[in-house]
Amino acid sequence: MGKQVRLILAGLLAITIVLALVPAFFFSRSDPALSPYGTPVLRLAFAGDVLTHQEQIDAARNPENNEYDFEPCFAAVKPLLKTADLAFCDLEVVLAGEETGYTGYPCFNAPESLATALKGAGFDVVSTVNNHCLDRGEEGVYRTLEHVAEAGLLSFGTYRTWEERNTPLVVEVNGIKLAFLGYTYSTNGIPLPEGREYIVNMLDEDLILADLARARQAADLVILYLHWGNEYMRFPSPEQEAMAELFLKAGADLIIGSHPHVVQPVAFIKIAAPENKVEEKPVAYSLGNFISDQRMPYTDSGIILFVEFVSEAKTGRLKQGEVSYVPTWVHKYYDDNGLNFRVLPVPQALENYRQGKDQWLDAGSAERLAEVLAETRKHLSSLPLYQEP
């Protein structure tokens, strides 16, 4: 038997093993009464970087009417996102309008319909602060905020006025007030406008500590988003770990990170709690890419992180419950109309392949899906896979 044949058979065997395991760990949720956390009062979903490279923009364009449709990109994950009370992603492109040119890397400007597609997929809140937020200058910041709001999305991290910047975004969900704060390490060398530096939240420890103190007064939970770290590195730096501990101790309840474009671990930092107790707060250093055209190792995948909160029976105090995730993969493929991109929830996609329910998934795609599942489970070994309620 030749080497190539042996490799093919080994790959098919790996897919078969993974497919056999998929239903057992994904498709049934255990009785909440048996959970150590109890029934959640709040379930949040967090996705990673939303990027539109040039091939994605071109693929979304309808040549008959020159309109751009990104909704099919997210159709497969829409049911998952709808199981959350609130869903978030990092909008790592600007929406500055067609007159400035729709472009991918290195200076991103996506069609405004991207925001509508994200809203339709189930997202409620987006971060607009990242190293690409000035890719069309100051006016691009304002236009992005305008188009995001028109789509019905809430945003944070970039602002029009000083007053906006000093008023944290607070969203009430199920009677619980959530504050969102966001910061970026860089704007890729593009300077902030003189006298209006407030339009972009830069990653500054003193600024963040002051904002955390303000947000704690306005909300029950504070979610801190940080665009940080080293691109394509699968583990956080010591500096990130130190910052995470500092900010969690200062009042953040949860840290969500992005920028590396690969999944990094989720850690739990021990923090002093009331009544001389100790609790663990999560930091997701990087959720990877939610959608992009990157194809370097590990950049074609990401996770949707689900974080649940429960109410303590005696005190009514909010407490973190289960933290789980669904690995995702960007499927780049051709159908009868040409090139397409779509985000697939990996376990569901593997099950669909096993049952022959997805005509666009071939053996090569199934092999990569199986690899993503194995890679992610190994990298996030302390976390369970999310089970739909």
Question: What are these language model-derived features?
Answer:
Residues 6-389:
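Acidic, metal/ion-coordinating pockets
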Residues 1-5:
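Short, Lys/Arg-rich N-terminal segment immediately upstream of the first membrane anchor
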